[in-house]
């Protein structure tokens, strides 16, 4: 595939990225009588497999990784090629991206935007707000390790497999009567890539191995069984390349001989060989590049040399499977799975292949485990896999869709730990972004625009049409709260609170009052990458910014309460949030993308940013905001289904949230086409961009379980194409691990394990018929209520598992969570308040309830429990309309305690209020398992 430099891509984007970038799709033809090989069957079909080698096609090679080290494995008979990456090898070196001309020109830029002089505003942004340099730097490869194994003649029974259950690529074939097998895996515990070659006839393995690289490198042979590649990253954008790296490959043989000289490793007549690859980098962090890269490479290699292959393999498996095995999924299998993976993709449009959806789902989880681990860099636009010095969009971090999308499946598919690199990056950005905030806006806090790189560039890049977007850092910082909703980890929140606060502080300092509408708005900003008039995207207060800022300011305020600090800041954050522009329905019945009802010149643009409120956020919901919900559907109809890989993936998530199973599944199918999925299942923008893989995994999870609305909604968008199946180990906000088994499109059995005490609200079609609920831990039947026909509510206890099932359904072992909750999950919230055995109740007599704050988009309530309560162990607040319909349920928010008084605050209702005057709402608080039912009525007046 042709490499795409940033500038080429920008030219293409200017012309409308979709059309300009589409390559010719590849093809693959069905094999008559094909059957899945034993390795794929042993993996329960969770394997990519092929009957041909990758040749020179990088998009046929198979990825392995341990978060830091990555390799693409080609599996050619004559030459094995491992294309190597290390996740800190970035072009250039530390730089300060802030442009000191910005702040002095900001007032004039804003004036031009408010005067609708968008083009003139963009000109001034070009002159004064662009980063230094005006583009960011690229993630670059280490090079290749090639094993020249001899001619490929006389070969039969060739297969190549990437087993997702073992994170191992295996290549095996028969050549001249000898069965050769190669296994490759990247070990996180031992920090090496392991290539194991075996043959079933003694002394049959002979090869020469060498490194090569597009970087500036020197090869050598440091000892008789090792070769080395010492290099430095490339110069770019006027910044001198400064990341030094050392790659070592060392052979351990049984039988035969091994020698190394002049950078060539020679193995002759061996019976088995283990090649260990170790890579060290001098990158310490975004501002320091003087690490002992040679020492790091050698130390890891020497340590791995003392470990035999069996132990290397078993440690790798234990480490990997502890993550991967948390989620099991079965969507059914047809004979389509007996074709090689590339054939399955090529035939997908005409085949019934439900297992491919399961494979795609698990591949995303595999890729996240392999590219993002505690202590590594976050997964970039290509995860960690890149063979080019000038990769598309620099293989960096694009924040206006791609980087957040990479992490959508992290919590929902039970890979909480894999999320951590993002929070490390956010803390870095809170430093580099603070300089940009000061220099370009004269503001406190920190800001990051639409991209960042290994050096944590935070300024405007690429040009105003793309780069002049203020809310990149805001989106990333809001993920801190989102992650907390899953884990309940107060220590995590405390550690990351300063970055969250700083992101909010920037907007408290910079939002400006719209001259005619009176709302507080960002200016200048854009609705990502979409021109509202020809060639201009810059505007004030685009809808996505307002949605992101509602989440950010809420998150910062709520976090400040959990952490117990900053009351003044909190009040300011809330007051500011209340003055953000509400979402509006435009003339076409759509969600308006900008403050004005403009019609975008490019109607089918890939970004649908203004539906951020539908997904990933929860500001547009079916039951909470019915009008906006319908407008969201209309918005998607107007934009159409087509788009880049990541755009399709986001649309799976959108349609899942719209509970439209057929459409969500159509989008899954649209993604599984040869122009959107490479033979190795890498998602194609095109070109390759990994966000589509992660977005697809997230979308499939959203089709099976949603938890954004204060309840666990089971099978909200189950397509007819998956009539029977099971999934287990999915995670829901509030700290739940969930399994479900279904047949005929309906749940037979739901199993939920609670991390914390609380009130569990389950929504499923199952509850419209006969069902039973059991506390699996002791076989008892917990008390339940039925707030809606398809909703069951019950009090749950930390560590216990609950099962709801149709009467007579035999428990399905695979839907019961088998692995413990992620280690980051704390027992209760907050840890400073020890659980108590007395179950005091916030009954109507003991509690007072009042609306504390209201605004056009919602309001907050407060319940104060004044007698008999010693501690809160779990609580929820439910808002209902006067007719009893539940409109919102809240688990997040804050409670505090002073003596015997317990206060639950900020139990926000975030839906739309019916227009005009006063609306009566019911406010139901459940604290320590008791509830004030019937609800206390509160009246809210729309302002
Ligand atoms: C944004 C998108 C492009 C591409 C790039 C990396 O600019 O609009 O489609 O995904 O990021």
What are these regions (language model features)?
Residues 810-841:
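Ser/Thr/Gly/Pro-rich low-complexity, disordered linker/stalk segments of secreted
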Residues 840-943:
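Extracellular low-complexity, O-glycosylation-prone Ser/Thr/Pro/Gly-rich "stalks"
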Residues 61-84, 88, 108, 128-129, ...:
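C-terminal capping/lid segments that line or modulate ligand- or cofactor-binding pockets
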Residues 2, 8-28:
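N-terminal export signals
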Residues 36-465, 482-484, 515, 562-565, ...:
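Aromatic-residue-lined binding/catalytic grooves and analogous aromatic/hydrophobic interfacial grooves
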Residues 205-213, 753-767, 871-882:
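Surface-exposed beta-strand/loop patches in extracellular or lumenal glycoproteins
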Residues 188-195, 199-200, 735-761, 861, ...:
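Carbohydrate-binding surface patches
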Residues 762-778, 878-891:
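Solvent-exposed beta-hairpin/edge-strand motifs
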